[in-house]
Amino acid sequence: MNFSAKTVVVIAIGAALYGIGGLPMFGVPVFANTTLKPAMAVLALFSVLFGPIVGFLVGFIGHWVTDLFAGWGVWLTWVLGSGIVGMVIGLFPMMTKNRLQQGELPMKDFALFVVLALAGNVVGYGSSAFLDTILYAEPFTKVFTQLSIIAAGNTILIAVVGFLILKSVAKRNKQSRNLTEA
């Protein structure tokens, strides 16, 4: 798979923003080793704008960066989970026929965005929780509680912040499409 220079730069910027924004100092601790991160909105934005492959790589590399800088070691199971979240949310442009790029954001598209955010969090971090119980013998109740908190919290955060961002993107795209030469 060959990436254009633009795509590589987008992935690098997205991963850096998501990775640094995911550090504990920017999050809200809610449970054992569980933090709600506003950086999830960054992952959602890059996924929606650039698709599932970029979304996966921004989530995967960005979470890796978070774990490296946080100092608790890289948890590949949760790194993979963030990649899956980005990939699932990245399906948005294909499922909406790129209406956002045309300056449109009907409520059905926003509802789909929220459903993809929830599905991405449940599937992505559900995979992480499952792998933690298998590979690291983590207690099921602990990882299930982490999954429940993360999926609900991230979905709410992505929905609220994402709505504001998506409305702004749609407005900008609509204005740029309406420019005419005088």
Swiss-Prot record:
Keyword annotations from UniProtKB, A to Z: Cell membrane, Membrane, Transmembrane, Transmembrane helix
Keyword Phosphoprotein assigned: no
InterPro entries, sorted: ECF_substrate-spec-like, UPF0397
Keyword Iron: no
Mode of membrane association: Multi-pass membrane protein
Domain of life, per lineage: Bacteria
Localization per record: Cell membrane
Transmembrane segments: 8-28, 41-61, 72-92, 110-130, 146-166
GO CC term, one of those recorded: plasma membrane
Matching HAMAP family: UPF0397 (MF_01572)
Family that this chain belongs to: Belongs to the UPF0397 family.
Protein name: UPF0397 protein VS_II0189
Organism of origin: Vibrio atlanticus (strain LGP32) (Vibrio splendidus (strain Mel32))
Taxonomic lineage: Bacteria, Pseudomonadati, Pseudomonadota, Gammaproteobacteria, Vibrionales
